């Protein structure tokens, strides 16, 4: 009888070890089987003028069958035009400000990115302007949207008169950008 009672604690330890091994295997298998989470990296352009429609391109990872954009304001809506391209309408009643946009697709809903509804004319970069002779004209009082390459220079031109005060704002933080801009203003002679 004494040998039987000493075998019980050893048997219990073996059963506990088996249960623990099973649980560890089940947890590992479950984490391997989880679907990827959609990741929205960028929305271009990052905004639009209130009362207009603009074409938006999305870039990210695991955006399989992305078929909708969800905005934090019901007055901003999107229609799928082609994979990763949407027509976004900003209703006249939308207030100037920043709103969240998320992608909805086969794998669920993505992280938010910032989309700005504004009241100024919007210009979107369509080609490189990395040399002074390729500078793009930006009218006063307008917004310029575009993506930049790290450590690259872009050139813009705008009309100005001697002694006139001009305010140039690079709103990177407002649009959730990692860019740290450096601006230099020169006259037509490059001074």
Regions found by a protein language model. Name each.
Residues 1-13:
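N-terminal secretory signal peptides that target proteins for export/translocation
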Residues 16-28:
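Bacterial N-terminal signal peptides
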Residues 29-33:
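Boundary at the C-terminal end of the N-terminal hydrophobic targeting segment
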Residues 34-78, 82-83, 92, 96, ...:
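Acidic, Ser/Thr/Pro-rich low-complexity intrinsically disordered segments
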């Amino acid at each position: 009888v004494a040998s039987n009672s000493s075998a019980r604690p050893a048997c219990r330890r073996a059963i506990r070890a088996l249960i623990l091994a099973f649980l560890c295997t089940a947890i590992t298998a479950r984490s391997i089987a989880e679907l990827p989470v959609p990741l929205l990296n960028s929305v271009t352009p990052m905004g639009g003028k209130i009362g207009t429609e603009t074409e938006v391109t999305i870039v990210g990872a695991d955006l399989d069958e992305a078929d909708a954009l969800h905005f934090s304001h019901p007055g901003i809506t999107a229609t799928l035009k082609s994979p990763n391209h949407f027509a976004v309408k900003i209703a006249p009643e939308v207030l100037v400000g920043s709103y969240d946009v998320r992608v909805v697709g086969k794998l669920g809903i993505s992280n938010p990115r910032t989309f700005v509804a504004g009241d100024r004319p919007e210009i979107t970069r369509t080609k490189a302007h990395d040399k002074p002779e390729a500078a793009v004209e930006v009218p006063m009082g307008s917004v310029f949207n575009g993506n930049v390459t790290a450590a690259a220079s872009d050139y813009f031109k705008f009309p100005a008169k001697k002694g006139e005060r001009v305010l140039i704002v690079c709103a990177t933080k407002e649009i959730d950008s990692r860019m740290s801009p450096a601006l230099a203003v020169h006259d037509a002679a490059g001074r």
